[in-house]
Design a protein with these regions (language model features):
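Membrane helical hairpin/interfacial module
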Residues: 2-58
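Long, contiguous internal "core" modules enriched in hydrophobic/ aromatic residues
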Residues: 42, 58-172
Length: 172
């Protein structure tokens, strides 16, 4: 049976993507820094922006198709691939940030990717129908992704401790 509201997942994804973009502006301290960052196409923020635009387009296509009662699995697979690219580029943007030595550890990329996978699996589990065949796989997948993210966080913490870095300023 088809989901009652197939458009709900892409709508929630689009809203969360929009909130993330607003968070980026606040994260930079001054929203105009975003414009300055975009002046350099090779900068991390520019690379993230290109992937966000591509992801947003795929999500809008998925939303329109779902709204019309059609779901195209290929669109969701493309969206997943673009989302993985976005996660990798975001992790690399932090890893390559010369001003923050704390992000230069090997655990940075897994922290970003596994954290996003854990959140995405959780969102899928929340929005899945109880009788959906995938729903039985989502709960263990969510727990596994969260456990893997926890291991990555511990590895990141050990890297910080071993390097003598204080990351408490990153919490603000």
């Amino acid at each position: 049976a088809a989901p009652a509201r197939p458009w709900l997942f892409p709508l929630v994804c689009l809203v969360l993507l929009g909130l993330g973009l607003c968070g980026t502006l606040l994260h930079l301290g001054q929203p105009l820094r975003f414009v300055n960052g975009m002046a350099n196409p090779a900068s991390g923020i520019s690379q993230e922006s290109y992937w966000v635009i591509a992801l947003g387009i795929v999500i809008v296509v998925d939303l329109v198709l779902s709204w019309r009662g059609k779901t195209v699995r290929a669109v969701r697979w493309v969206g997943g691939a673009v989302a993985v690219g976005f996660m990798v580029v975001t992790g690399l943007a932090y890893f390559d940030c010369l001003g923050l030595v704390a992000w230069r550890g090997a655990a940075t990329l897994p922290v970003f990717i596994l954290g996003d996978v854990a959140l995405g699996a959780g969102l899928c589990a929340v929005l899945a129908k109880a009788d959906d065949w995938a729903a039985s796989l989502l709960c263990p997948a969510t727990v596994a992704a969260q456990a893997a993210w926890g291991v990555a966080i511990v590895a990141f913490g050990l890297y910080l401790q071993r390097s003598g870095l204080d990351a408490t300023a990153l919490l603000a």
